[in-house]
């Protein structure tokens, strides 16, 4: 099978992680990273060149090259959405990057430019749009609909029959119970539980843990003597 040449748009932490997963997928031949010139921090990453986006069309024709957009969740994923739309308008294909260990049924519907990491579990009868990042250990349950340009941090859990719109962020180990509707641009913080529908631009944050007055040695001494 002839491998498809591919570039990663981005040179930050998420782009580095995507690169590591992409290298596991045999159908791709990785060429290098590409970003706007003002964001180029170094000439090479992991030994691969970082190209100036200005020369994309000239150097890398769309018939021969694909591009995966790997930009973070800043500005409620709008930065990544803007770049995604720009590259799609130029006619490039943006394939999904899915870790081979991800548990994904064959019958789910998935758009393009989705990053699905290792040990993600997606149940049957799920629809996922475009340009979403689903990090390791996340669970997307049956009959869930996910829109576009969302970010699911590691350990996120979405229960069945839930509908998530666009440009949402879900923090570490956040959970959504079943039959919930989540509007556009919602922010759900780490360890938060969503049990009611969320309107557009809602923010849900779990109270932080309290720092104990005892230090670790005093606390463990108490525990040992208590039992």
Language model region names:
Residues 96-212:
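Structural signal for interior beta-strand "rungs" in well-ordered beta-sheet cores
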Residues 39-103:
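Phosphate-bearing ligand-interacting subdomains
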Residues 16, 20, 78, 148, ...:
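Alpha-helical elements of the RecA-like P-loop NTPase motor core of helicases
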Residues 204-227:
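Short, basic/aromatic-enriched C-terminal tail that caps enzymatic domains
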Residues 14, 72-75, 210:
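Short glycine-rich anion-binding loops that position phosphate/pyrophosphate groups of nucleotides
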Residues 19-21, 46, 80-83, 128, ...:
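Short amphipathic alpha-helical segments
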Residues 4, 65, 184:
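Nucleotide donor/acceptor-binding cores
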Residues 1-61:
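Hydrophobic, well-ordered beta-alpha structural blocks that scaffold small-molecule cofactor pockets
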């Amino acid at each position: 099978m002839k491998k498809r040449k591919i570039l990663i748009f981005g040179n930050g932490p998420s782009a580095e992680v995507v690169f590591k997963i992409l290298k596991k997928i045999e159908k791709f031949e990785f060429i290098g990273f590409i970003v706007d010139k003002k964001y180029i921090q170094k000439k090479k990453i992991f030994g691969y060149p970082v190209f100036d986006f200005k020369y994309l069309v000239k150097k890398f024709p769309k018939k021969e090259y694909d591009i995966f957009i790997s930009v973070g969740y800043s500005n409620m994923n709008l930065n990544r959405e803007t770049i995604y739309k720009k590259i799609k308008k130029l006619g490039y294909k943006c394939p999904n990057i899915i870790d081979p260990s991800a548990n994904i049924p064959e019958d789910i519907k998935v758009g393009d430019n989705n990053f699905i990491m290792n040990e993600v579990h997606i149940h049957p009868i799920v629809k996922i749009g475009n340009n979403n990042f689903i990090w390791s250990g996340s669970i997307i349950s049956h009959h869930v609909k996910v829109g576009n340009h969302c970010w699911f941090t590691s350990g996120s859990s979405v229960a069945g029959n839930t509908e998530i719109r666009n440009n949402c962020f879900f923090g570490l180990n956040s959970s959504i119970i079943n039959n919930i509707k989540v509007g556009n641009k919602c922010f759900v913080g780490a360890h938060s539980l969503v049990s009611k529908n969320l309107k557009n631009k809602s923010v849900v944050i779990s109270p932080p843990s309290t720092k104990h007055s005892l230090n670790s040695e005093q606390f463990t001494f108490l525990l040992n003597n208590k039992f």
